[in-house]
């Protein structure tokens, strides 16, 4: 009998994560007057990043419930590895 993996996105403690479209990302960066790498990073190996199928270079919007503000929005830049960058493959 195979066991079905739980969907971590449905857990009550995991906030909503969504990948921004190219247009949304460009607008966000223009509004904040920053480059993507100036956002906080999130690893491509993060379980939620894998679940939403984000790719390196994507920007993720995280929407958390907040008791004081109602909701808090944060953004993360998806990188290959936040601790130890992988070496580029030789072509």
UniProtKB/Swiss-Prot annotation:
Gene3D superfamilies: RPB5-like RNA polymerase subunit (3.90.940.20)
Any Pfam family the entry gives: RNA_pol_Rpb5_C
Entry keyword set: Cytoplasm, DNA-directed RNA polymerase, Nucleotidyltransferase, Transcription, Transferase
One CC-aspect GO term: cytoplasm
Molecular function as annotated in GO: DNA binding; DNA-directed RNA polymerase activity
Catalytic activity reported: RNA(n) + a ribonucleoside 5'-triphosphate = RNA(n+1) + diphosphate
Keyword Transferase in record: yes
Name of the top EC class for this enzyme: transferase
A biological process term (GO) from this entry: transcription elongation by RNA polymerase I
Transmembrane domains' residue ranges: none
Subcellular location: Cytoplasm
EC number: 2.7.7.6
Subunit structure, interactors included: Part of the RNA polymerase complex.
Family according to the record: Belongs to the archaeal Rpo5/eukaryotic RPB5 RNA polymerase subunit family.
NCBIfam families found in the cross-reference section: PRK09570.1
Function: DNA-dependent RNA polymerase (RNAP) catalyzes the transcription of DNA into RNA using the four ribonucleoside triphosphates as substrates.
Protein name: DNA-directed RNA polymerase subunit Rpo5
Record gene name: rpo5
């Amino acid at each position: 009998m195979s066991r079905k993996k739980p969907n971590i996105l449905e857990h009550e403690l995991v906030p909503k994560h969504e990948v921004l479209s190219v247009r949304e990302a460009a607008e966000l960066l223009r509004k904040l007057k920053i480059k993507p790498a100036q956002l906080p990073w999130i690893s491509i190996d993060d379980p939620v990043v894998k679940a939403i199928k984000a790719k390196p270079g994507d920007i993720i919007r995280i929407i958390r419930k907040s008791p004081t503000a109602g909701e808090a929005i944060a953004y993360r830049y998806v990188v290959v590895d936040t601790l130890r960058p992988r070496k580029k493959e030789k072509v």
